[in-house]
Structures are given as C-alpha cells and as structure tokens.
C-alpha cells in the first residue's frame, strides 16, 4: 500500500480526541486501505506501534509489530509455542512478532493476573517526537480490547 508521512508533535490532530471507527457496515475497503497504509508506515518507520492520528487520521485505531515478550529479543518461537497460538488473533505467521490492529481500543489496567499492579519506569519513544526518549512510569500489565482488521473482537494483554 502506501507509506504515509508521520505527523510531528504540535499538529492539532495529535491533541484532539479521536473518533470511534464506525463498524456498523463492517470493515470497509477504505478502512482496509487505512490499516494497510498504517502497517506499511509502521514497517518503514522501524517503530513498534502507530495510531491513526499519527498519520493525520483522527480515528480510534492502532497497529503494532512487537517482539514477543515471552522470548529473548529476536528469538524465534519454538514450534510447540507456535502451535498453541496458531489462529489466535494478533499473532503473525512468522512466530517471532506479535502483529495486530486494534480498532476502537479500550485499555484496562486493573485485575492483573498476579493480583497486583507494579509501576515500572522505562524509556519510551514516539514516532511523532523523533529522536527523543522519555522515562515514563507504566504498569507492568495492561489489557486492550477492541476489534481486529476483520471486525472481530480482539483482546491483547501483557
């Protein structure tokens, strides 16, 4: 598809609330094109996540392409792990990265599996603020629900 320019901090589209994506008619060809453009833009950027407003579209969706946190960085998944995850939404076929699109995401940070939340300070970057890393406090667990690129429910957590 198309690699779109990434909007830089200060642009109003990054500061305004995003609009819910209307899925009443299913995933439209226009939405499929937007998602494909976002995936291509993310791949070209070298980032791990991209929201629609970062390419100037004020809609509520994002794409990710992240290393699987259950493995050492860059390590391939063993075949038995691939088999247990095969066909689950949000998993790429290469067995290395978690690749997903989440439409109309809802973030939850309560009810972690271990029963407690821990704040962790880590460095984080943003494609809309190029060349800068920030030390941010994040919970060690979060869950996001929404709809995938086929309009089916998806839940990602970690």
Which positions does each model-derived feature cover?
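Active-site rim/adjacent substrate-binding subdomains
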Residues: 1-158
């Amino acid at each position: 598809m198309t690699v779109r320019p990434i909007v830089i901090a200060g642009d109003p589209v990054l500061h305004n609330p995003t609009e819910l994506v209307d899925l009443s008619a299913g995933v439209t060809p226009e939405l499929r094109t937007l998602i494909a453009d976002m995936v291509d833009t993310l791949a070209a950027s070298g980032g791990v996540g991209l929201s629609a407003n970062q390419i100037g579209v004020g809609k509520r969706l994002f794409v990710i392409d992240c290393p699987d946190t259950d493995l050492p960085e860059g390590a391939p998944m063993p075949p038995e792990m691939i088999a247990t995850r095969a066909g689950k939404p949000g998993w790429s076929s290469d067995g290395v990265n978690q690749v997903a699109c989440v439409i109309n995401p809802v973030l939850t940070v309560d009810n972690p599996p271990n029963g407690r939340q821990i704040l962790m300070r880590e460095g984080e970057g943003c494609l809309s603020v190029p060349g800068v890393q920030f030390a941010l406090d994040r919970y060690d667990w979060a869950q996001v629900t929404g709809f995938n690129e086929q309009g089916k429910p998806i839940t990602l957590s970690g």
